[in-house]
Design a protein with these regions (language model features):
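Glycine-rich, anion-gripping cofactor-binding loops and their flanking helix/strand elements
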Residues: 39, 55-59, 71, 205-292, ...
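Thiamine diphosphate
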Residues: 95, 103-104, 109, 299-300, ...
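Glycine-rich, acidic loop regions that bind phosphate or pyrophosphate groups
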Residues: 95-134, 232-336, 462, 471
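Phosphate/pyrophosphate-binding active-site segments
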Residues: 1-4, 151-152, 163-164, 168, ...
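N-terminal cofactor/phosphate-binding cores enriched in small/glycine residues
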Residues: 2-83, 87
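Active-site diphosphate/adenylate-binding microenvironment
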Residues: 3-8, 13-17, 22-35, 337-425
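Structural signature of the thiamine diphosphate
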Residues: 14-18, 59-96, 116-168, 189-192, ...
Length: 474
């Protein structure tokens, strides 16, 4: 009979093409077995980089990836990007060694409790049903859009699986029934949009994942709406002349002023966090806010009407209701040339009086110099707005911001690895800071090894800039 590790590797290879990780005592047999499959293993220097790379891979190409690490210290090293993936709703499978079935050793920790503390589920493999448990981990990650830890006890990794006659029936995922759209709510939303003088459609990453860009563009044309996106939805509306760019701190004052004028706002697949909402000042309090989301618990306090459903289905239903409504609102006619992103905040001088570079000027020049077929990977830090604000983003999966959900820094190089593997023919534009870059410098080598063509931009303010600005005046 095949070993537990061989069954896990073979089963996983049917669903996952790329695995990122660091080999250790707890996952060596799994990685050895993985070599016999079609799955490709990309090594990184730190366990945190393994999870961050798998996270960025999904964001860049939409396909499930896996990360792997050993038990104990290897597992504790990956907790921060695991927490990030949970909060950002990124599906991935993390295959880790764990304490043997015979009991905890001095160097073991309660990995299930640690994973649970950051919101990740753990499935522990046994000899009886290694295949079914691996299938379940993959299905759970996909259905919940969350990371799932698949733990392999140290003393069974090399052991043979149980005889198939003794194994339980393979686990099969139940397809969740799709609730029908509420016709009355669709009618109410359509009526509000039809009666709007200044309609705005604000879309996020959820709209991109649902592939709703086209139908939302049609809906915007139906009602004469301007459009905008969250940071993670940047590029959804392409080069539409009516797109205001990113809502929130990465947008211009002019575009924010136009968004504040909206009297009806349709929010699609965006969580409306405090940054998108400009800390409460983005929208007029009198505006009617309609929200589309698959999660009935996602309702934001400013939402007047929540439409629960797939963004494409709801968008199409609204388009059908508004098929005869083709009047262009005066708002579009008077909006003129819509400012995009931070482009109106031009850096007039390349080199300032203190001999330092103006980042506005630098990023504008980089935008002109770099190929448009790009994936922009943005590390966390005080400089976080320059690349999204000044570099053109072709589509939402071309801006990778691993770390924003948990407010981390130092995941840039690792995220670049995942983006490079997911989009090997594109130019990877990695923006990091001196603080975050030095924090994760070991995985610069991983990034170089994985990338065919790429540019690393280090925004160096000689310190942790966010803290200098936040506390320097206090």
């Amino acid at each position: 009979m095949p070993s537990v590790s061989a069954v896990i590797a073979t089963t996983l290879s049917a669903h996952v093409h790329d695995v990122f990780g660091v080999m250790g005592n707890g996952n060596a047999y799994f990685l050895d077995a993985l070599e016999t499959t079609s799955t490709v293993f990309t090594p990184v220097r730190h366990e945190a980089a393994a999870v961050a790379a798998a996270d960025a891979y999904f964001r860049a190409c939409g396909r499930l990836a896996a990360a792997t690490a050993t038990y104990g210290a290897g597992f504790t090293n990956l907790i921060t990007p695991l927490a990030e993936a949970v909060r950002a709703r990124i599906p991935l499978v993390v295959i880790v060694g764990s304490a043997p079935e015979s009991g905890m050793r001095d160097w073991d920790v309660d990995q299930t409790a640690l994973a649970s503390a950051v919101g990740a589920a753990t499935i522990t493999v046994d000899r009886m049903d290694a295949q079914g448990q691996t299938e379940r981990a993959v299905a759970l990650a996909r259905s919940t859009r969350m990371p799932v830890v698949l733990a392999v006890p140290y003393d069974i990794g090399r052991a043979s699986v149980a005889d198939p006659d003794d194994a339980p029936t393979s686990w099969v995922a139940d397809d969740a029934p799709t609730a029908p759209l509420d016709a009355d709510e669709i009618a109410a939303a359509a009526a509000a949009l039809a009666g709007a003088a200044r309609p705005l459609i604000l879309a996020g990453r959820g709209a991109w994942l649902a592939q709703a860009g086209e139908v939302l563009g049609e809906l915007a044309d139906c009602v004469g709406a301007l459009t905008a996106t969250s940071a993670l939805g940047a590029g959804l509306f392409g080069d539409s002349p009516w797109n205001l760019g990113i809502a929130g701190g990465f947008g211009s004052h002019e575009s924010a002023a136009l968004m504040h004028e909206a009297d009806v706002v349709l929010v699609v697949g965006a969580r409306l966090n405090q940054f998108t909402m400009r800390f409460g000042s983005l929208l007029d309090p009198a505006a009617t806010v309609i929200q589309i989301d698959t999660d009935p618990e996602s309702r934001h306090p400013v939402t007047d009407l929540l439409l629960v459903g797939d963004a494409v289905d709801v968008g199409r239903a609204l388009c059908d209701r508004l098929a005869e409504h083709r009047a262009i609102t005066p708002w579009r006619a008077t909006a003129g040339e819509v400012p995009h992103g931070l482009s109106s905040m031009v850096g007039e001088v390349a080199v300032l009086e203190d001999a330092r570079l103006d980042p506005r000027n630098v990023f504008q020049r980089l935008d002109r110099a770099l190929p448009l077929d790009r994936v922009v990977v943005q590390d966390g830090g005080h400089f976080i707005g320059w690349a999204p604000g000044y570099l053109r983003i072709p589509a939402p999966n071309r801006l990778i911001m691993v770390g924003t959900a948990l407010q981390t820094i130092g995941l840039g190089f690792a995220s670049g690895v995942g983006a490079a593997v997911a989009a090997p023919d594109s130019t990877i534009v990695l923006a990091t800071g001196d603080g975050g870059g030095l924090m994760a410098l070991s995985d610069l080598q991983s990034f170089i090894a994985a990338t065919r063509r790429g540019v690393v931009i280090v925004v160096n303010d000689a310190g942790y800039g966010a803290e200098m600005h936040q506390y320097g005046s206090k």
